[in-house]
Amino acid sequence: MLNPIVRKFQYGQHTITLETGIMARQATAAVMASMDDTAVFVTVVGEKTTNSSQKFFPLTVNYQERTYAVGRIPGGFFRREGRPSENEILTARLIDRPIRPLFPKGFCNEIQIIATVVSVNPQINPDIISIIGASAALSLSGIPFYGPIGAARVGFVNNQYVLNPTIDDMKSSFLDLVVSGTQNAVLMVEAESKVLSEDKILGAIMFGHQQQQVVINNIRSLSNEASKLPWIISYPEINTELELKITKLAEKDISNAYLIFNKQERYEKLNFLKEEIIKLFFSENSNIDISEIEDIFEKIEKNIVRKRILNNENRIDGREKDMIRALDIRTGVLPRTHGSSLFTRGETQSLVSVTLGTSRDAQNLDELLGDKTDNFLFHYNFPPYSVGEIGIVGSPKRREIGHGRLAKRSLLAVMPKLDDFPYTIRIVSEITESNGSSSMASVCGASLALMDAGVPIKSAVAGISMGLVKEGDKYVLLSDILGDEDHLGDMDFKVSGTEEGITALQMDIKIEGITNEIMRIALNKAKSARLHILNVMKQALSKPRNEISEFAPRIHKIKINPEKIKDVIGKGGSVIRMLTEETGTIIEIEDDGTIKISATIGEKAKNAIRRIEEITAEIEVGRIYSGKVTRIVDFGAFISIGIGKEGLVHISQISNKRVEKVSDHLTVDQIISVKVLEIDRQGRLRLSIKEVENSIISNKSINNIYI
């Protein structure tokens, strides 16, 4: 007999339901989590056997959307879901980031979380309820987990914070912020805004964290009622004797190695020291656990770096805590691209290119919440050579997709409207060197490359990564962190924006105890750093170039009567196909009669515009036109005076004299002047040649619109 255990509660304007005990009973834990009609089935499976050789925590989070959730059958040949979409990968990261820090240190058992979207209300994004479902499932599983956590989306509409706004609400929101944390601490923030102040952003974080307490309390209540027995985990004992020996032998040398400013030289020295220590202890005891030595060595490194920072000594590369690394900025570095830049900050470097295309180049996205077209693409590539390593080069990894999305969100607030700049824009950031903050270097480089391409962005955007080292009540905030400072520190806080305010923010915190005041100071320090970088960027390129690249397509817009669209397209697309081939342009037609003509050579575009105007010109009764004879019949001749515009010259209208045989006077393809006598209700034209002869014709009175 199935005995469901259900917890239902109100969360803002939505009803949350958490149900367990019916489905997937062989999983370690399973929860059906729903927010109104949007439901996500979340399972957790943990491996109870510990792999002693495992050096990292093997947590896998999979988020998968099923099209049956919205009553659709998948497209494609196989008619089933395939590889995860970009949105699925990003949502999986959103679930992973706040829960990963909450597992005990040294816990290396394999854990897999699968969140399957099984029902979707088109007004409710499944991401928030997915995080809540994962938190609930982990809390029920018995797996060591310092949760539960809550999650909230915060919008900013009419100068008010809105909890978990609907999709329609988000259309008028100046903020899209997701915050997740425990009862006492914020652990993760992901935000995009339309240039809001630091105070507004901090207020949204606090609002979201406060509101999600109801979620945390209800998960606790569900856990008290239905959780499994906690796992009994034995963690490897610390070999204090070995730690003391290695510390005594290597601490001073490791400390000296961290006085080497160059990353590669420092790593070479540290690797040499580590190998020497391993050789020494291995010669004394061939059964010694090498991974244990490596762990102790890393622990000593961490203690040295953190102690120096907390004592206000210089950082790894010799900087003070608020100092930004040296900047080198260049634009127009790739001659045949539409826009480019090379942004270097210390040992982090991004080569950014911008490509302008037409609406045909836009990406069509088939998503559960509705199909949409994306005219702004941002791709971030992190090749192994950027950190001096050898690796597999292939499709983008989760991290690359996540960094690309963050950089894209940083720029959205300043991008021109499609009506004002009708181009599809693709930005590619190639990370050629990396030592921390490569995503923020991509933002800076992309802003410069857009201006180099002549894209009329509203203002320049820069990004900065802040770090934190905290022990007890003592803490130090770091500006423009290195890769090691990110790895050994307690927080990675990325902020991007303009001179006026923040456009995007991403925060991941590894510890509890980050107060509102610490976040406020971090935001203000990030602002100072951002303004400094923007000032240097302004010296390199202060505003968008006046014209787009000579190699970029020029897009010209004209408007025609929507009823004339069929004439431009022609039967089976024959006319538009002929126009594109003969003029060498790309022609796109919208339902409202807007036509976009794109070509890299201006004369080609002008030719296409002239041809379209000829096709769509209104035929007027009494006007004289130059046309071409297309057919001859016994009772007259058909004359084309434009594509799709053919009229009849009756035999009686060919000449003032009697005509016995039409072919005696006219031949096919002959160019002839005709006068429009009548347009009947069906749009058919009655033409005359003899009326032209009876008229006084000037060159200007003839409309040469034959094709």
Curated annotation (Swiss-Prot):
GO terms classed as biological process: mRNA catabolic process; RNA processing
KH domain ranges (all copies): 553-612
Binding site for Mg(2+): 486, 492
Origin: domain of life: Bacteria
Annotated keywords: Cytoplasm, Magnesium, Metal-binding, Nucleotidyltransferase, RNA-binding, Transferase
GO terms for cellular component: cytosol
InterPro entries, alphabetized: ExoRNase_PH_dom1 (IPR001247), ExoRNase_PH_dom2 (IPR015847), ExoRNase_PH_dom2_sf (IPR036345), KH_dom (IPR004087), KH_dom_type_1 (IPR004088), KH_dom_type_1_sf (IPR036612), NA-bd_OB-fold (IPR012340), PNPase (IPR012162)
Alphabetized PROSITE patterns for the sequence: KH_TYPE_1, S1
Statement: the UniProt record of this protein carries the keyword Cytoplasm: yes
Enzyme class, broadest EC rank: transferase
Molecular function via GO: 3'-5'-RNA exonuclease activity; magnesium ion binding; polyribonucleotide nucleotidyltransferase activity; RNA binding
EC number assigned by the record: 2.7.7.8
Residue ranges constituting the S1 motif domain according to the UniProt record: 622-690
Subcellular location: Cytoplasm
Its job: Involved in mRNA degradation. Catalyzes the phosphorolysis of single-stranded polyribonucleotides processively in the 3'- to 5'-direction.
Protein name as it appears in the record: Polyribonucleotide nucleotidyltransferase
Native species: Buchnera aphidicola subsp. Schizaphis graminum (strain Sg)
